[in-house]
């Protein structure tokens, strides 16, 4: 949970009537038709995303009753047979499709708290329309239409409980939960793989559990130990299911979450941990993130200086630059929750990662209000949103390769081993990078490397492959070696491993083979290799001498 420092006010003309029926209300059957058309359109445009094809594939999960108009609903949520859901507004002057996901379900008995706040914001906006008495509203003009958008940047689906809470304070024999503010921060830090260390963080008093949270010592973070998912929600049995992970993997992600919580002075509790959203800014800067990062708000009575177009333009600018956004939605009556905005699409919907084990992560509108005054003035409504923009490391390089492909087969030491890094992408503040391929022994040491390859920040085509070759030393010791793809910025001695192969290069005597293990007793394989392309016929004595040479 994140707290707001002031109570949010609502517009005075809200909730003027609780009995009038507005002609703009949408029935459940009409909403089902809208949902069905939307799902069909998406299934045709992108097969395998939204899988429903008929009205019978939609199951009503929830109809949110209006609190200001009788016999009306603010929105409807439909689960899609085969996975996914879609949320439809109950007022025809609002944005029709408020949100959707192509996986999982939506269960209003197990709703992620950040999504609950987001939906409460939609509810208040829709009820504003339901009770609006003027006749001067017209559809808002479309000010932006994305051609491609940005696919979700965050791949993690982390949460707040086991095992993420393993290093949180204990109260009455229970771990306190991580808190949504810290969970969002931790996922963004994992995305950037930064920082790799933290200074000590002092103790503070936690009011919810009435005890001091002890100081934390300086530490390091090993992001290579962390994984994208530790648990997931089992919809069939309505329970959280643990994925496979090791104890070091769990402890490392728990440590990252704890340091994030300590940095914002998290008010810990086993039932729910909270912190002020704006405390994230100072915390991220204390971890070494850009000093130019900013905290901005929209939709509060004391600070409503951004139009929707301006707000969404800022979001897209961040995402186009590859910067996921620490975001928050606030409910005036219950505070709010932090989450992450990490993508947008051509329909002006934004991808939210709620930090709830992947539950209900999907595409949502930033506002349900789809109308403006006839004179062009935007409707002002106090549905508070907040975000941190410009959050990135001061100097960074993050490079990924989808796969490492290594030429298989037998070789003699001294030959060249060919390797390819496929679908290479990177984000960096450096103008150019150097990459190479290295042979790695069982202890993790780089034994030898290819020539370095220089790639330019602005000239390299993202998603391309990079090829190189390693000359196998004639003195290479027997054993098993993996092949790694490395990058470095300016100092070649500070190479960072991007990826290493699971298959091994086996070396026996003077013979090497990548892939399956082999023994030198497989004489026919050795002879076939040595004779390949040769017109000379070797006798038994000659072959024996040749093998003796290779072994010695």
Describe these PLM feature segments:
Residues 443-463, 468:
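Solvent-exposed serine/threonine-rich low-complexity stretches and specific carbohydrate-binding patches
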Residues 89-90, 95-105, 347-367:
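Catalytic Cys-His active-site segments of thiol-dependent hydrolases/isopeptidases
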Residues 58-82, 287-353:
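Active-site-adjacent substructure of cysteine-protease-like catalytic cores
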Residues 186, 511-552:
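Alpha-helical segments with a strong preference for the paired helices of cellulosomal dockerin domains
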Residues 94-274, 507:
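Active-site-adjacent structural segments surrounding the nucleophilic cysteine of cysteine proteases
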Residues 491-511:
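Short beta-strand elements
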Residues 24-69:
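Short, non-transmembrane alpha-helical segments in secretory-pathway proteins
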Residues 375-423, 445, 507:
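Short, compositionally biased P/S/T/A/G/V-rich stretches that sit at domain boundaries
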């Amino acid at each position: 949970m994140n707290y707001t420092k002031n109570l949010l006010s609502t517009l005075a003309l809200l909730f003027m009537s609780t009995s009038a029926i507005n002609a703009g209300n949408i029935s459940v059957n009409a909403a089902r038709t809208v949902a069905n058309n939307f799902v069909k359109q998406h299934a045709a445009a992108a097969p395998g995303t939204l899988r429903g094809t008929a009205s019978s594939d939609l199951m009503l999960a929830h109809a949110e009753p209006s609190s200001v108009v009788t016999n009306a609903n603010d929105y409807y949520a439909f689960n899609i047979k085969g996975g996914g859901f879609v949320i439809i507004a109950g007022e025809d002057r609002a944005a029709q499709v408020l949100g959707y996901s192509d996986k999982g379900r939506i269960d209003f008995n197990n709703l992620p708290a950040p999504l609950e706040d987001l939906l409460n914001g939609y509810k208040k906006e829709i009820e504003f329309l339901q009770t609006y008495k003027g006749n001067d509203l017209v559809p808002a003009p479309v000010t932006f239409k994305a051609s491609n958008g940005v696919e979700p940047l965050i791949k993690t689906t982390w949460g707040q409980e086991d095992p993420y809470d393993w290093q949180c304070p204990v109260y009455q024999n229970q771990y306190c939960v991580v808190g949504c503010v810290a969970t969002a921060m931790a996922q963004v830090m994992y995305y950037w793989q930064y920082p790799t260390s933290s200074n000590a963080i002092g103790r503070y008093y936690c009011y919810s559990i009435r005890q001091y949270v002890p100081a934390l010592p300086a530490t390091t973070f090993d992001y290579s130990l962390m994984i994208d998912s530790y648990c997931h929600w089992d919809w069939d049995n309505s329970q959280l299911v643990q994925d496979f992970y090791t104890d070091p993997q769990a402890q490392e992600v728990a440590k990252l979450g704890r340091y994030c919580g300590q940095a914002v002075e998290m008010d810990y509790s086993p039932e729910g941990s909270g912190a002020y959203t704006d405390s994230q800014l100072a915390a991220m800067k204390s971890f070494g993130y850009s000093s130019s990062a900013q905290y901005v708000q929209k939709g509060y009575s004391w600070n409503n200086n951004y139009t929707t177009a301006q707000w969404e333009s800022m979001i897209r600018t961040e995402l186009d630059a590859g910067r996921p956004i620490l975001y928050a939605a606030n409910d005036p009556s219950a505070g709010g929750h932090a989450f992450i905005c990490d993508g947008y699409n051509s329909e002006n919907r934004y991808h939210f990662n709620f930090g709830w084990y992947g539950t209900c992560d999907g595409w949502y509108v930033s506002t349900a209000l789809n109308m403006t005054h006839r004179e062009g003035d935007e409707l002002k409504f106090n549905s508070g949103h907040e975000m941190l923009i410009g959050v990135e490391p001061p100097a960074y390089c993050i490079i990924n390769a989808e796969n490492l492909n290594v030429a298989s087969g037998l070789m003699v030491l001294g030959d060249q081993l060919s390797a390819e890094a496929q679908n290479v992408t990177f984000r960096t503040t450096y103008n150019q990078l150097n990459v190479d391929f290295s042979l790695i022994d069982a202890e993790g040491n780089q034994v030898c490397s290819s020539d370095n390859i220089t790639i330019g920040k602005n000239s390299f085509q993202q998603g391309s492959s990079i090829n190189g070759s390693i000359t196998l030393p004639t003195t290479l010791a027997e054993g098993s070696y993996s092949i790694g793809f490395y990058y470095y910025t300016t100092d070649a001695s500070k190479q960072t491993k991007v990826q290493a192969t699971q298959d091994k290069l086996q070396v026996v005597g003077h013979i090497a083979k990548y892939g399956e293990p082999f023994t030198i007793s497989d004489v026919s394989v050795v002879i076939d290799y040595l004779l390949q392309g040769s017109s000379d016929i070797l006798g038994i004595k000659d072959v024996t001498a040749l093998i003796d040479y290779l072994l010695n």
